[in-house]
Amino acid sequence: MEIFNTVASLKNFVAHARAERKTIGLVPTMGALHRGHISLIHRAVAECDICVASVFVNPTQFNDKRDLECYPRTPEADAAVLAEAGCHAVFMPSVEEVYPEPDTRVFDLGSVAEVMEGKHRPGHFNGVAQVVSKLFMMVEPDKAYFGEKDFQQIAVIRSMVNLLGLPVTIVACPIIREEDGLALSSRNVRLGSEERAIAPSIARILGQSRTLRPAHTPEAVTRWVTESLNALPHLQVEYFEIVDGNSLQRIDNWQDTDHAVGCITVYCGEVRLIDNIKYED
């Protein structure tokens, strides 16, 4: 596996791959890699001739300076994990390499970027669009792979791709979970022992909420999930919304969509965890 720290060296690698008519799959990450990331690498390796990963903690998508400072960084371990997973190249740049000048672009990402995470983390999705668009222009991938734990982010990136007219297919990959149900996240390492013990309750309560669907409205299910989690120690729901999986607009009736998704953000102690559940039949 080759490791690149500069845009020029990455573009040179991509140019050679393109000259050989090879397809390229891109897996953008912020590092602190876990089995969820590796599942994306395996999918890209299976579907494309060349798999390129990026490891970059993007400062423009953090609206909380402390969250940026606390985000785990393990570049040496990440490189080893990627090599073992069969990745062909990894881009591990400095902030200055990605942003030689401040990125002042403001994207019109539509309503999918204004709700849920967009409402609670102002500027977050514009920062995501800034860095992902840069990566897409550097690598020019045929496909790019993202995990469905970040369900709203995938919708936002698809909106950006349509806005810019980029020739890349966005591939959404299933959530990977611990045996106890907790969605894998780089932030999980920050959980204390008591918090880690209670965190799987998020997925458990979401799973139980499926059984309420036949006899309860989305509003009633939303209320039950929120109250059930808030009643547990260390957990505080920031939001839980049941939305149409395409528009991400809240639904009042199950009949409003055949693709209902419940999206949640919960503080477990001081660690912000996200998850989601599909309510499809």
From Swiss-Prot:
Molecular-function GO term, any one: pantoate-beta-alanine ligase activity
InterPro entries reported for this sequence: Pantoate_ligase, Pantoate_ligase_C, Rossmann-like_a/b/a_fold
Entry similarity comment: Belongs to the pantothenate synthetase family.
A GO cellular component entry from the record: cytosol
Subunit structure of this chain's protein: Homodimer.
Any single Pfam family the record assigns to this protein: Pantoate_ligase
Gene that specifies this protein: panC
Binding of ATP, residues: 30-37, 147-150, 176, 184-187
GO biological process: pantothenate biosynthetic process
Positions contributing to (R)-pantoate binding: Q61, Q153
Sections of the chain in a coiled coil: none
Disulfide bridge map: none
Protein role: Catalyzes the condensation of pantoate with beta-alanine in an ATP-dependent reaction via a pantoyl-adenylate intermediate.
Catalytic activity: (R)-pantoate + beta-alanine + ATP = (R)-pantothenate + AMP + diphosphate + H(+)
Pathway: Cofactor biosynthesis; (R)-pantothenate biosynthesis; (R)-pantothenate from (R)-pantoate and beta-alanine: step 1/1
Additional observations: The reaction proceeds by a bi uni uni bi ping pong mechanism.
Positions annotated to bind beta-alanine: Q61
Entry EC number(s): 6.3.2.1
Subcellular location(s) per record: Cytoplasm
Keywords: ATP-binding, Cytoplasm, Ligase, Nucleotide-binding, Pantothenate biosynthesis
Active-site feature positions: H37 (proton donor)
Naturally occurring in which organism (per UniProt): Porphyromonas gingivalis (strain ATCC 33277 / DSM 20709 / CIP 103683 / JCM 12257 / NCTC 11834 / 2561)
Protein name: Pantothenate synthetase
